[in-house]
Amino acid sequence: MAYAYLFKYIIIGDTGVGKSCLLLQFTDKRFQPVHDLTIGVEFGARMITIDGKQIKLQIWDTAGQESFRSITRSYYRGAAGALLVYDITRRDTFNHLTTWLEDARQHSNSNMVIMLIGNKSDLESRREVKKEEGEAFAREHGLIFMETSAKTASNVEEAFINTAKEIYEKIQEGVFDINNEANGIKIGPQHGATNATHAGNQGGQQAGGGCC
Amino acid sequence: MNFLRGVMGGQSAGPQHTEAETIQKLCDRVASSTLLDDRRNAVRALKSLSKKYRLEVGIQAMEHLIHVLQTDRSDSEIIGYALDTLYNIISNDEEEEVDDVEGKRFEDLGSQFTEIFIKQQENVTLLLSLLEGKWRTSEFDFHVRWPGVKLLTSLLKQLGPQVQQIILVSPMGVSRLMDLLADSREVIRNDGVLLLQALTRSNGAIQKIVAFENAFERLLDIITEEGNSDGGIVVEDCLILLQNLLKNNNSNQNFFKEGSYIQRMKPWFEVGDENSGWSAQKVTNLHLMLQLVRVLVSPTNPPGATSSCQKAMFQCGLLQQLCTILMATGVPADILTETINTVSEVIRGCQVNQDYFASVNAPSNPPRPAIVVLLMSMVNERQPFVLRCAVLYCFQCFLYKNQKGQGEIVSTLLPSTIDAMGNSVSAGQLLCGGLFSTDSLSNWCAAVALAHALQENATQKEQLLRVQLATNIGNPPVSLLQQCTNILSQGDKINRRGSKIQTRVGLLMLLCTWLSNCPIAVTHFLHNSANVPFLTGQIAENLGEEEQLVQGLCALLLGISIYFNDNSLESYMKEKLKQLIEKRIGKENFIEKLGFISKHELYSRASQKPQPNFPSPEYMIFDHEFTKLVKELEGVITKAIYKSSEEDKKEEEVKKTLEQHDSIVTHYKNMIREQDLQLEELKQQVSTLKCQNEQLQTAVTQQVSQIQQHKDQYNLLKVQLGKENQHHGSQSDGAQMNGIQPEEIGRLREEIEELKSKQELLQSQLAEKDSLIENLVSELLQPSASAGDSEKVAELKEELATLKSQLNSQSVEITKLQTEKQELLQKTEAFAKSVPVQGEGETPAAANSTDVEGRLSALLQETKELKNEIKALSEERTAIKEQLDSSNSTIAILQNEKDKLELEITDSKKEQDDLLVLLADQDQKILSLKNKLKDLGHPVEEEDELESGDQEDEDDETEDGGKDQDQGYL
Ligand SMILES: Nc1nc2c(ncn2[C@@H]2O[C@H](COP(=O)(O)OP(=O)(O)OP(=O)(O)O)[C@@H](O)[C@H]2O)c(=O)[nH]1
Ligand SMILES: [Mg+2]
């Protein structure tokens, strides 16, 4: 319950790139080997710590399938961060990035932080997209970039946390209007109170969906 | 459209010709007039006609009105009239007084016009854009927004799914409608809630978007602002919307829980004890609030989701608040019933919450457990039926996956506790009372409740066999089991209120639950020679449809008596019972009767949900948990009946070998566990010893430095005495000094002597300890002696403790010594000071002076000797310190040895693991043997189950959504 900030995220990208797996790995530290097609949108949450502050992440994992596009677009506006995911073993998912980015830029608020993720880095032998290509795309469009594996959990934490750091910095710089909830940011109930006091009894509840 | 034409054609007696013409004229004006004022007046006129001549206006004016919406957007008034007119055409709301036939037609009318309106999807989009808060501050907005909201709500009510789909695909459609909740004008906000209700009805995707747009926060804020349950109909509307958003929507439920919104529900239930305000609105609101809690912890939700919500509800005090309502007075019956149902689901299968519930007391004098108070209502005929059902549900939920609670309930029936209870009535007594009362409903409820105390709990099934009942005075007590079967067989003699079937079905369900998986209970049951003939008699008879269910249950009970029979009764061995069935009933017939249970019309209803929810008492036949038991046993009993005795034997053998393997594995597991424990103990002992040793060492160091100080003080003393000697060689009045000093020194010397002897003792004890350590080490070198080690270590520990205490007392004595020396020193000083004064005042006496001189030199001598002794003492201390050091290092070595030992234990563990693998191989072999058997044509499926049973246990738990899953989802 005692968080300093709450950030809303969305995860977008082609079907099958591993969006749901990334979320599951982040919230439950599990991997799901079977493709369980997401219908519409699914919700997940976790607490993280940045700069000694508790930050609650509320994450909406969207369906990549084209037919759900109109539904998933509704989630851009209220999100502070987006993970745009492609699959390094499928070039077409990389090629579609431009479309995704246009869609995101068009429907989101202009300050939304976008993290580009090349997922399935564990499948090196089947790689079709070089890491450098991902880096170049990110540089060109002003995104943060990371390669991850939802299977081995490599860089998964980092992907979510670095996005939050970026948002957090933007808040510090005063870029975000934190009083407008439509930006996907909410100030916690105890913001401003000395953090040390409640950081202590929160310690055990960082991982998973611990309530309160 | 055909329909419309039909209606038009048949309505010659409807509006007069002139009205139709008027409408036509007005439409023409709307379409062609170039003056806005003119058009506005025409639309206003259409609006006023639209209620009375709904059909005509609808048909003729719809497209013109839509056109107005598209083109006249700058004028809020005309848009407002157009929207109002469209609303009148489409909505059925105002037509409630119309009689049935008429009403039906108007309903159709509304949906027909809706269909026409939404045929062009842009019309809906147009409406959405009008609702957008572009003119936020102006009056304009209000004129447009309000009728717009009402129109869209009507469209959604008429053709929900289609309109929802259009809104879903129009960009930001849903999100924009969410803004209505933020509207500062209450009318619009409140109608916005109604619109969202229609919008979210059974559409998961829209529900999620609405939740994403902070609907929970908004709605909870509104409810709080309006005064929670004391609020008006807005609160009710918000609660219905919340229910729409959460019911059967796992994603939203998770979001609700993660957003800490459960905590915000708690104040809803702070309704206080005052009986003042229970308005109809408040009752409705509270009802919805309770239902919302239930939505979050419904048994049909994924187990992990429910359990995390249950935990949150306990942590934030919501459960406690609900229990307060439960025990409060003056609460309306339907609220009380729903509160009981809610508490039930909040505690179901959640140990912490169940434990809390068990601790709740009613505020009576003396306080009674809530469980007892509730059970009183369950077996009380005067209580409303729904309330009694709710109590039963609550009791079931309390016992669900709660072995502790089951044990507590059963224990209230056991002889030892009954005596201890004294006069206060117990849960067990109430259940027995219900079981044997003359009210069939109480019989059924008590039987089912008792069955739940036995569910999946072999221990309690056995414990309950011990229960004896006192019957008529003079007759011997009868066991509970016996009494149940007695009532079954003589049931018809007793005159009962309610249905006889209900009593018998209840008792049979209890017996089936009791006997399943409990061979001892089966033996007890068969021991009464009247039971089997009774069952076979019931099953064999050709009875009417009424009795079919009882026959089926009797067949199930007999089947259980065969399947869980351990052949301990000669006359009722499995094989004999099977032969009996063949002879008296016939296998086919038996199986058919068994099938009556699951074919019963009420069976599937009960199998769907755990809550005993019956429209009226006659429907109260099946218990949910019992349907699970039937599902589990129907197949296996059928197989068991058809199986030959040879197969039975083989199965028995396989079972035995498996059991043997199991016991070996268990044995090893236990051994490993024990060794682990020992290791842990030893580790702890070593660490405490180490710590003690350190303390001792510091104590010795301190003492050494104290001795040094003493030495220094003696030196000082000596020097001072020397000086005194020089200056006052002819001191005459030294008697005072001489009288004291030698005495003091004598005492000092004695004490030092004592100290010395103590130290000797200490030394010898150290030596003892040394040898002990040596023994210990040598024993440690033999790994097999691990059990003995702990004793040695304990001894060593003890030795160290005495050593430590001796050192302590020594140090106390040294302190004493020190203070005495201090005194001595002071006295010497005082003397030294006093001498010159006295010397001036009196004439020195030569004889005395020589005496003093002699004494002083003796004193000097003695001091010297003392000094030597102290030196020796300090040397001894150093030696002791060294010895302690060395013993310390011995202990370090000891620890090393222990580590080695640990390693060896790990090795032996590995060996045991290998053994386990070997065992697994053996199991594998048995499996393949069985497969071969199978190949040879012997059906061995059941054996498979038995074999894998042990391993599957854990998996089963997970599937059932037990504790494992709770953790998994956290
Ligand atoms: N080897 C490997 N496989 C992965 C990884 N991430 C996901 N997968 C697999 O990829 C498939 C699709 O994963 P999902 O997470 O369901 O895909 P999604 O992006 O959510 O797909 P949609 O819900 O249809 O949009 C599954 O079979 C996963 O097991 C990864 O990092 N490495
Ligand atoms: Mg997915």
UniProtKB/Swiss-Prot annotation, chain A:
Instruction: Tell me one GO biological process term.
Output: protein transport
Q: How does it sit in the membrane?
A: Lipid-anchor
Which Gene3D superfamilies does the protein's record reference?
Answer: P-loop containing nucleotide triphosphate hydrolases
For the ligand (Mg(2+)), the binding residues are S20, T38, D61
Tissue specificity remark: Brain and parietal cells.
Q: What post-translational modification information does the record give?
A: Prenylated. Prenylation is required for association with cellular membranes.
Enzyme Commission designation: 3.6.5.2
Any keyword Membrane?
Answer: yes
GO cellular component entries: acrosomal vesicle; autophagosome membrane; endoplasmic reticulum membrane; endoplasmic reticulum-Golgi intermediate compartment membrane; Golgi membrane; melanosome
User: Residue ranges for motif Switch 1?
Assistant: 37-42
Q: Which UniProt keywords apply?
A: Acetylation, Cytoplasmic vesicle, Endoplasmic reticulum, ER-Golgi transport, Golgi apparatus, GTP-binding, Hydrolase, Lipoprotein, Magnesium, Membrane, Metal-binding, Nucleotide-binding, Prenylation, Protein transport, Transport
Known catalytic reactions: GTP + H2O = GDP + phosphate + H(+)
| Matching SUPFAM superfamilies | P-loop containing nucleoside triphosphate hydrolases (SSF52540)
UniProt subcellular location:
Endoplasmic reticulum-Golgi intermediate compartment membrane; Melanosome; Endoplasmic reticulum membrane; Golgi apparatus membrane
Region of interest (Required for interaction with PRKCI), residue spans: 2-19
Q: Where is the lipid attached (S-geranylgeranyl cysteine)?
A: C211, C212
Instruction: One Pfam family, please name it.
Output: Ras
Q: What does the record give under GO molecular function?
A: G protein activity; GDP binding; GTP binding; GTPase activity
InterPro entries to which the protein is assigned, alphabetical:
P-loop_NTPase (IPR027417), Rab_GTPases_membrane_traffic (IPR050209), Small_GTP-bd (IPR005225), Small_GTPase (IPR001806)
Q: Which domain of life is it from?
A: Eukaryota
Q: Which residues carry this modification: N-acetylalanine?
A: A2
Summarizing activity control, the record says: Regulated by guanine nucleotide exchange factors (GEFs) which promote the exchange of bound GDP for free GTP, GTPase activating proteins (GAPs) which increase the GTP hydrolysis activity, and GDP dissociation inhibitors (GDIs) which inhibit the dissociation of the nucleotide from the GTPase.
Quoted from the entry, the domain comment is: Switch I, switch II and the interswitch regions are characteristic of Rab GTPases and mediate the interactions with Rab downstream effectors. The switch regions undergo conformational changes upon nucleotide binding which drives interaction with specific sets of effector proteins, with most effectors only binding to GTP-bound Rab.
Q: How does it assemble?
A: Interacts with PRKCI. Interacts with TRIP11. Interacts (in GTP-bound form) with GARIN1B. Interacts (GTP-bound) with HOPS complex component VPS39; interaction contributes to obtaining a functional HOPS complex that promotes autophagosome-lysosome membrane fusion driven by STX17-SNAP29-VAMP8. May interact with VPS41.
Protein's name according to its UniProt entry: Ras-related protein Rab-2A
